[in-house]
Every structure is written in C-alpha cells, then in structure tokens.
Amino acid sequence: ILSLAALAIMMLPSDMQAQNFDDYFVDKTLRIDYTFAGNKTQQMIAVDELNVMPRWYGKKQRLSELPVAGNGQITVKDHRTGKVIYRNSFSTLFQEWLSEPESAGNTKSFENVFLVPMPKDTIDVTLDLRNNRREIMTSLTHQVAPSDILIHHKGEKPTPYETLQQAADTTRCIHIAYVAEGYTEEEMPIFLQDAKEANEAIFNHEPFKSMR
C-alpha cells in the first residue's frame, strides 16, 4: 500500500503539469521565415516574414520536449508567464555550409522556414544555432503577437485537390501531398492515375500496410 501511495504522489505533479494544446494554441500554423547569415567566425539571425496558415499538422502532445538534439532549437514561451509551451530541433544547410572551408573566407545568407502552432496570446520565440559540441553560436529572441497586422494570412483560398486516402482522424496521421509538377491541365487524369499507383506502392509496405 505504501508503494502504491508513493507512486500516486510521484505521478501527481506530472499529471498536473501536463500541457493541453488548446490552452495556448489555435488550430492554425504560424510560419516564421528567417535569414541565417555569416561565416565561420560570426553568424546572425534575422526575422524576414510572418505568415499564418489554416490548420496545424504538427505535434499536439509533448509540446515542450525535443524529439532529437539537432544543431539548433526553436523555443516558444508564453510571454505573460515565461512558460515553455513549444520546442523543436533542427539542422540546416547554413550550419552544414559553416563546416566547409569556403565559410572561412566568404559570407553567405540562407533562407530558413520554421512552423510552430499559432498562439492565442503573445509569445517569445527564441532561435539558437549550435556547433557540433552543442554550444550556442548565435541566438535571437523576438516577440510575436497574434494581433500583429504585419502577419500575412495565406492558404485561405481553397486549392483544387482530390483525396486518394481518407484518414479516420486527420489530426493523427501522416499527410502526403502529390504535386502535379510537370503535368499539363489536360494531363490531370494521367497525373491522378500515377498518384494512385504511387499511393498503393506506399501502402504495400509496412508499417503503412497494417495501419491503412
């Protein structure tokens, strides 16, 4: 009985601290465009553009946990409380370029796009780049207010599409988009047939086959 009581007490704080997606976010995506610039000895990060798009297709559980370490991290905090409400890791082409000899004598800039869930209230976003020893090379923190008139709204006009495989729950599935690049409008029937064949090929293999 003592062991069970102790276990219940130990588990209580974890349950109390469990984060609910709907407490801080709405079902939309905030796209943040950054510019990474610099060379082997000096780097900088700048915000380029903010966009909001319909629906959020990323994680809704374990929002503040990192899946893998990566060479960089994006951290979202609730501005009012300072609580971490979303984190993710990444590795970029810019960081890969910094490991090349060219970066010792040249300065370049790279465009980078990050997606986070759209917040209900003002957030503080911190982006940091790390070296191979996980030491922070450069970092940027900036605020995002959902009411900011400079945030562009995109993707609200419907784009023609056809569903090949309907998920039972669209919030807990992998979304695959087949893009008709290289096909003319008259070749849409051919494209759809090719897409269906590609889709069937995917579901012929595990783990997709048994989870279809």
Where are these regions (language model features)?
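Composition- and surface-driven signal marking solvent-exposed, interaction-prone regions
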Residues: 18, 88-90, 191, 199
